[in-house]
Each structure stands twice: as C-alpha cells, then as structure tokens.
Amino acid sequence: LGAAEYKEAALRRIRRLKEGGFNAIRGAHDPRSREVLEACDEIGMYVMEESFDVWYGSAGVYGYTLYFREEWEKDLELMIRKCFNHPSVIMYSIGNEISETCTEEGIRYGHEMTQLCHKLDDSRPVTLGVNLMLNILAAQGKGMDAYGGSVMNKADVVDPKACEPDSDQNGSVLVNNMVADFADYMKNVNKPENTDGPTKGIFGELDIAGYNYGEASYEKHHEWYSDRIMVGTETNLMNMKERIEMVRNQPYIIGDFIWTGWEYLGECGVGVIDYNENTGNYNKPYPCIVAGCGLYDLIGHRDTLEYDLMIAWGVRDKPHIAVSHPKHAQDEMIPGLYRSTDAIDSWSFEGYEGIETCVRVASPGKEVELFLNGKSMGVKLLEDLYAEYLVPYEAGILEVVAYDENRNEIGRDRLVSASNETVISVRTEKETMDVGGCLLYTSDAA
C-alpha cells in the first residue's frame, strides 16, 4: 500500500499465505516491517529476515552500493535489534545475489557480518541467498562491467531520481536476461563442479548455505561437504513436485523459498505468457507493470499455480480446473521465465463456442475424469499431478472428478459459465473492525 504499512493489511497477507500452505516467508530483499513481524508472530509464520540486496558492487542505479561500506554495520545491528524479541524470526540473511562473495573481500565482509549477527543474537543462524550462476560469471571476470554494468560513484549523483531509459543492466536483471537468451549455455555451465569454487568460500562463513536456483548442485555439494546445511533461498515453480520431494527426503535441506508468494510492481512481465512473439523477457512494454509471477495477485486472489502447490504440498485434497482462453487456440505460446501457464479458473468465453481449448487439471490421486454438461470427456491418468484435455467450448458446467488407485472418488471441482447479467457485489472479509483500522474487502462479479 505505497510506502505505508497497515496492521490489517499485513495480517491479511500473512493469513492468506498460511491458508495456502506456506509456513515461512523470506523478506526479499530488505527487512520486513514491524507490522509484518507481528502478524507472523500472531499467525504462526516463520521468517527469514534479510538485510541487503546489494553490498559494495554495482547493482542498480545509484543505490545503497554508494553507502554500504560506511553504513552496513549500523543497519545490520538495527535490523537484529528490531527482530530480537519476535519469535517468528528464525534466521537472518545478510544479502541476496551478492556476486562479490566470490572474492576475498566479499568473503571477508560475509565473515564480519556473520560474526556481528552472532554477537548480537547467538540464537539464530545466518544465511545468504547466493546466485550460483552470478558467482560463476563474476569469478570468471564476466561480472557487471563485462556485460554492460557501470561502476557507481557518489560524485556522479546529480538527481537521485533520474534514470536514463537506456541505462545499463545490473545484478539480477542482467543475469535473468542472460538466462533467457542463453538458456542452454547457462544449463551447461551451472553444474556442481562449476558452482563449487566460486561459492565454497562464502558458504564456509555461513551457518546455512543459501542456494538461489541451485538445486542442481544440492546432491553433489552434500557429498563434498556433508556437514553443510542448505536452504533453497530462491527457486521458481518449474519441477516443483520434484523439488518438494527433494526437500522432504533430504534432511540437509531445510526448506525451499519460491519466487514469489505475492505479486509486485516492477520486473515487468517476468512471469507473463506471450503468444507468437516474445515481447521481452524481463521488461515487457506498457501496459505491463507487474512481474506476473505472484502466487497471489496484488489484492490477494490465488493464482492457478498456487492451487498446484497446495495440491503438491497436500494442503488441498481435491482437484483444480484451469482453462486457457480459446482465443489463443491457434497461437504459439511463449512461456514466461517464471510461469508455464496462464490458464485460469473460468468457463465463460462467450463468442468462442465450438473452439477447442486446453483444460488443465491438477489433482491428488491416480486419475481424473472430466465432464462437460454431464457428458464424460474421458478418464486420464495423472502425470506429476496433471492431466490435460482439449475441449470445444460450450457454456454450462465443466466438472472434474478425482479418483484414487482403487477408483474411489476423492474430490471434485467445477466451473460454471456466467450468465449474461452482470452483478457487482462487495463483501467485507470481517464483520467488525478495530477503531482506527482500515476496511478490507473484495469485490465479486457474477
């Protein structure tokens, strides 16, 4: 809500995440407000409290990099003192995707920060979200300057709010664009034998090794460093079932933080699906203003992929139907970097009668059966939670039934086409509100 935080809004966000199966949040990539920490204390949500998104290396235009060396100790101490009496805070993170951590100076700063955390609070472990690929590139001299980044100097600052439209790419933005453009190359480079050297120094200073998109290195790194405790500090939703099983089955991996729980402004279109033409990997043109990868949208509605996660976690015990818009039936889909589908839970596509569209079912169990207006569209075995049908659009009721291995029904989901009449209703989420509080509501169209 802009630069302001409200108790009711914080409680609502944390409550929605908790209801959706999350048991921990990571403050990405700056400290959380007191209201958020109080909400986590009240509701029961673990917190990884994170201090910095940059250190002294250039990342972003004239930001904290300019002041890091003189301010980090004071700011880190303030964060720890704020968190000390909040039981929800279970660990501290001293940074995110800091490529300097592949250098001696960066490792020294990591050591000093970890020691300060231990001095002020020896009850909580310390981690850092290391982007393994970013460290590989930096160790090879292919850091920000080599790929178009710029070195920031205080003397250059004329207008802190100014930003040239053709300004250089830095940090995570640069790496994500490189990943999109050179996916095969990155996959070949991002192997355990390559990620070890540029990360073992900083990991040796931390209580818990934080891996950003580094799950391919978990197993080998554990073989080489059997006492290393790991956490997936940042991952995307690709292969999520496999990752969930990995975390459950490997005691040295304590958890997995997914990018991202709540939708946000900026990094425009990183999770937006295109058709026929890629309009940009990380900077799609206006009117795209959101990232498009939140499991909850800006006002807290669940995304299709959040339902998938709930099923994978075992929080939801029935299927979920999502449908691709039939207007794209003949188009080539171009997935976003952080999204593989734009299907939604709707069966209202007036004007597209008879056009085949993809119906995507996520479900627990062994198999599912889809019905359109009472007629079976067939039984399909689930593959990694999913089954897909091509169904000609016809207004009415689309329903799916999930079965276990003994063909016993375990749950249903249904979509009903909207009528021609539009009705706007507003319902409050609470019957009462505290004096001085803010009213939270959702609007529904039926």
Question: Where would I find each of the regions flagged by the language model?
Answer:
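Active-site-adjacent substrate/metal-binding segments within catalytic domains
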Residues: 1-57, 61-111, 122, 126-127, ...
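Conserved small/polar residues in nucleotide/adenosyl-binding loops
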Residues: 441-445
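Substrate-binding clefts and catalytic carboxylate motifs of secreted carbohydrate-active enzymes
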Residues: 90-92, 115-118, 126-437
